From Swiss-Prot:
Top EC class of this enzyme: hydrolase
Protein name: Glycosyl hydrolase family 109 protein
Segments of this protein annotated with the region Disordered: 440-459
Gene source species: Saccharopolyspora erythraea (strain ATCC 11635 / DSM 40517 / JCM 4748 / NBRC 13426 / NCIMB 8594 / NRRL 2338)
The protein's Enzyme Commission number: 3.2.1.-
Stated role: Glycosidase.
Cofactor field: NAD(+)
PROSITE patterns per record: TAT
Cleavable signal peptide: 1-45
Cofactor annotation comment: Binds 1 NAD(+) per subunit. The NAD(+) cannot dissociate.
Binding-site residues for NAD(+), renumbered to this chain: N70, R71, D92, W141, E142, W143, H144, E161, C162, N190, Y250
GO MF annotations in UniProt: hydrolase activity, acting on glycosyl bonds; nucleotide binding
Cited InterPro entries: Gfo/Idh/MocA-like_OxRdtase_N, Gfo/Idh/MocA_oxidrdct_glycsds, Glyco_hydro_109_C, NAD(P)-bd_dom_sf, TAT_signal
Family: Belongs to the Gfo/Idh/MocA family. Glycosyl hydrolase 109 subfamily.
Amino acid sequence: MAGDESRSNPFSRRTLLRTSAAAGAGLGVAGLSTGYGAAQPVRPAKGESMMGVAFEAHETVRVGIIGVGNRGASMLPLFLAVPGVAITAVCDVSADAVNRAARAVTDAGHPEPAKYSAGEDDFENLLRRDDVDFAYVATPWEWHTPMALSAMRNGKHVGVECPAGTTVDELWELVDTSEKTRRHCIQLENCSYSQNEMRVLRMVHDGLFGQVLFGAGAYLHDLRELLFSKTYYAGQWRRAWHTGLNGDLYPTHGLGPVAAYMDINRGDRLVRITSMSTPAAGLAQYREQHMPAGDPTWNERYVKGDATISLIQTEAGRVVQLAHDVSNPRPYSRLNQLQGTNGVFEDYPARIYLEPTHSNDEWGDFAEFADYDHWLWKEVGPGPGGHGGMDYIMLYRLAQTMRLGLPPDIDVYDSATWSAPFALSVESVRRNSAPVDFPDFTRGRWQTPHPGVDSPKPA
């Protein structure tokens, strides 16, 4: 957990064995046994739909944090800053990390949380507590689904860092368990709460872009130094994924906002994906330039193509482009593009062109549309913390929905849908970029209107 939870190489334990065996059987990481592009079956429901289901109201939202490394430790003070939130328990396999987290809570003037660090399964004891309403999971990816499932089975709502799951089977299990236990499972996608993304979303819903046709999202972030750091990702777990799978390993930052623009699972749905990857070159080159002879990294073979590009089509015929590259030198970007019949928005840097306001092929100033900022940004944001304030806005809104007894903005169907390109892109790349169908995690309810990220201000 320390450094996002101190786990050993995920491919030395469960993940590589599972995914490699599946691929060898012609199933791929997505667990698909059907032919290219064949429709995926809808699984029988284990309970009633969780769409639009409200939280029970909480006077205080009591949070248990699993994983207090880089991400978890950075989010801890933001939870404490949100009105009506208390941290009652923290867990990590590193006792030092747990003690630091507990001290941060008490230093902020709050009671000391219960501490769990007795091995990699001690999170189960945290989840059995009766003073935890919401479990926050900030651990290596292979633990997201098991921990979320345990949380729900122990009666806790759960929020998971990206992605919610790494296989289609995992995602279906999250959906099934949420429906069966009546507990919410939320992909904590902070980028959905970024100021620009929320402003564009308001403009879409006010009709400024006309008919929405195309969107693009990405995770383009030079992580080479961090991936090879001996301390940042404890156990160097994140680089290990590049030795096992070739696809878009971090789709939700780009897809979550674009899915909101297109009302995915609220009138439209993702139907199929086609993905392709470049050669894997960047990490090997970085290793050659920076790692000494004899370093254990020289035993690694990187199979994850540096750039993975995916095209997704929706039921309404719209197209989404996703991109992922963490292995090459470049400025940070999530692309965040939207094209409609009335104009276009492109981010990094933010610029806009809308008829009839703009003309002569000259970009307009996006700041001129500040009146369309979401009410969360007008009245709450940016708040403390990094990432431009979107982390705090996300946690504020989460706690608000739990305290007032409202439905969450992001439900288990969104969480599964946004995370699915992880597995589906790997399968498409393995099949020489053949189309692979998206499961309908909503079981046919994707046209049902229900609350989303563009939430109205509570009365």
